[in-house]
Structure formats: structure tokens, C-alpha cells
Amino acid sequence: MTGLDKTNDALIEVAVLVTDGDLEILGEGVDVVIKPPAGALESMDDFVRNMHTTSGLLEELDGGITLAEAEEACLAYVKEHCPEPGKAPLAGNSVGTDRAFIERDLPTFAEFMSYRTIDVSSLKELAKRWFPRVFFNTPEKHGGHRALADIRESIQELKYYREVLFVKEPGPTSDEARAASKKFEITPQ
């Protein structure tokens, strides 16, 4: 993105990876650069311009594809691994902004995806509050703010949280889970 403003900024790179229930990546994924509309780069602030210059993304924009081509590639890949509409959640770090741009620029893809979101950043925030040792040992990121690298790092981070934050297999018995649930149930008044 040329920034985080859904009204004024442009989507300039899209990457998609589908995983199975064990967070293993299925297929090759999608990683495309989108040619921005005329004038889209002029409003980019210095921080974003420097980030995209350092990552090499700005150099690639002239060879980018259209939003329609990007949407077609994303849909084809997701449908290959999750053919039923509304079943594939959007996942990653701070994906609320991503979803806003996807809904604006890739509406057919947005409609195909589930309304549900798996935001790895939420787990990070919970770890910071409840398990600081987990938070302070989160895997380092080296993706340089490129879409595909960011997704791969989000998957690895989610695997880390699964290993260190969640109850180990087989988890509680059904009776134990019901008993715990009862402790937190709010009864109607």
C-alpha cells in the first residue's frame, strides 16, 4: 500500500498463502505487484517511500499488473485449496487494514473469503499482557515489508504462539472444557 488511508492510498502489492489446519502452506501462493494509478505515488509519505525503496517494491511498480488480474490470481489460488465460498478466513498481522483495501479493490475476492479474521497481532497483544516471556521471545521478522515475506512471517509467528501459548494436545477432556465454560458463562437476568 502507498499508505494506510483506504480513501486516498493505493494497493500496490498482494500476496496470498493458504495453509492447512497445521499451518502448512498449500501450493505456491500468489505474489504480485500492482501497477498504481497515476499520481498514487505522489502522496506517499517519506516513511512509506523509504520502506518501499529499501524493499525494492518501488522499482517493480512499472511492471505491475492490474487490480483485476491480481484479483483473478488470488481467487484462482484460494478456490484451488478452499473451493467453498465464505470458508477461508483472512489471516495475518493487523489484517483489518488489509481487509479494508481488499474490500475496496478486490471485491469479488473479499466476497469469497470468510467474514472471519485470524489476527496474529491480537495474540501478540495478549501475550504481551499475560505472558511477557512469550512476547519478548517472539520470532524476529526479516521480511522487509514485502507482502509474501510478511505472510510467511505471520504464519511462523502463529506457529510459535500455538506452541507456547495454547494448551498442548490432547487438551482438556469434554467434561473439563464444560466445567471451565460454566465458570465464565453469563446467565441472563
Region spans (language model):
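Active-site-proximal helix-loop-helix substrate-binding element of RNase H-like nuclease domains
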Residues: 36-39, 46-48, 120-155
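Conserved non-catalytic scaffold segment of RNase H-like nuclease domains
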Residues: 1-90, 139, 185-189
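Short, well-ordered beta-to-alpha junction loops that form the rim of enzyme active sites
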Residues: 91-96
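Substrate-recognition/cap helix-loop segment adjacent to the acidic, metal-dependent catalytic center
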Residues: 80-82, 97-116
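Acidic two-metal-ion nuclease catalytic site recognized across multiple nuclease folds
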Residues: 141, 145-189
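Short conserved catalytic/interaction loops centered on acidic-Pro-aromatic/His motifs
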Residues: 110-114, 134-138, 167-173
